[in-house]
Amino acid sequence: MNDIKQLLWNGELNVLVSIDPSFLMKGSPREIAVLRIRVPRETYLVNYMPLIWNKIKSFLSFDPLTDSEKYFWFEHNKTPIPWNYPVGVLFDCLAGKSATFTTSFENQVKDVLTFLRIHLVMGDSLPPTIIPIASSKTQAEKFWFHQWKQVCFILNGSSKAIMSLSVNEARKFWGSVITRNFQDFIEISNKISSSRPRHIPLIIQTSRTSGTFRISQPTISMTGVNPTLKDIEGDILDVKEGINGNDVMVICQGIEIPWHMLLYDLYSKLRSFDGFLYITLVPIKGGDKASSEL
């Protein structure tokens, strides 16, 4: 199982970051406004903000680290996107709303998104539901650790396991994300995980035709059961809208997942670096209800 986890851990995406002209002084070279980077699927976009600021610092029209009157966020095709989801999760959802797929997800994304294209913008106020990009170097770490507290509680019924980590273990845990140390990550995360979870930390994301994300976090009990995805289809899909499993593909970590997959097996193998299992629902061509409602 660790072989699968390490493949996911080592997975990377091409990310093209374009900088809004409002950040730069007049006369700045056009090429300075575009940055191409390779980013792990299992990280946050904001972890690369120091790299972005460093590239454009000589051409900035203001100091973003001290300006408290401006808010910064990312967009894709003029739609705000949250930095607080793993990069791979964002890619899966953005690829999913770029087309309606008729063949395998893996083949289609090659044509739809060669790069994860994001735009760094700023404004006097934030779009709804978007967490601003802060100058604090600990912003991502604090958010990520809070995610793991939630995960620990969902799995075990309490946060005792993660709160019992020593200061050095907690630093080592986050450090494993920054330095890409897989062994350290597995060592610490296994202390939090449970072989007999009470519930599964699950987040479902779907792209609406408006370009916004629909996020749900169903509560899936695992007490005495180990359901398949098909068994919990009603929790995964918005059945009130008449959508069923024939209308959508289930995508996790860029992989198309069959409905007969056991939920605990899926969680054990494909959970993300923040402890949650992210499932992306992608409309299938011919699924009229999915195409109109998602």
Curated annotation (Swiss-Prot):
CC per GO annotation: Atg12-Atg5-Atg16 complex; autophagosome; cytosol; membrane; nucleus; phagophore; phagophore assembly site; phagophore assembly site membrane
Per UniProt, location of the Glycyl lysine isopeptide (Lys-Gly) (interchain with G-Cter in ATG12) cross-link in this chain: K149
Predominant cellular place of this UniProt entry's protein: membrane
One BP term from GO: autophagosome assembly
Transmembrane spans: none
Induction details: Translation is induced by nitrogen starvation. Translational repression during nutrient-rich conditions is dependent on 4 uORFs (upstream open reading frames) present in the 5'-UTR of the mRNA; these promote ribosome dissociation. Translational induction occurs in conditions reducing translation machinery efficiency, leading to ribosomes scanning over the uORFs (leaky-scanning), and increased translation of the mRNA.
Molecular-function annotations in GO: cargo receptor ligand activity; enzyme activator activity; hydrolase activity
Membrane topology note: Peripheral membrane protein
Gene3D superfamilies: 3.10.20.620, Autophagy protein Apg5, helix rich domain (1.10.246.190), Phosphatidylinositol 3-kinase Catalytic Subunit, Chain A, domain 1 (3.10.20.90)
Source taxon at top rank: Eukaryota
Keywords: Autophagy, Hydrolase, Isopeptide bond, Membrane, Protein transport, Transport, Ubl conjugation
Family of this protein: Belongs to the ATG5 family.
Additional observations: Present with 606 molecules/cell in log phase SD medium.
Record's protein name: Autophagy protein 5
Source lineage: Eukaryota, Fungi, Dikarya, Ascomycota, Saccharomycotina
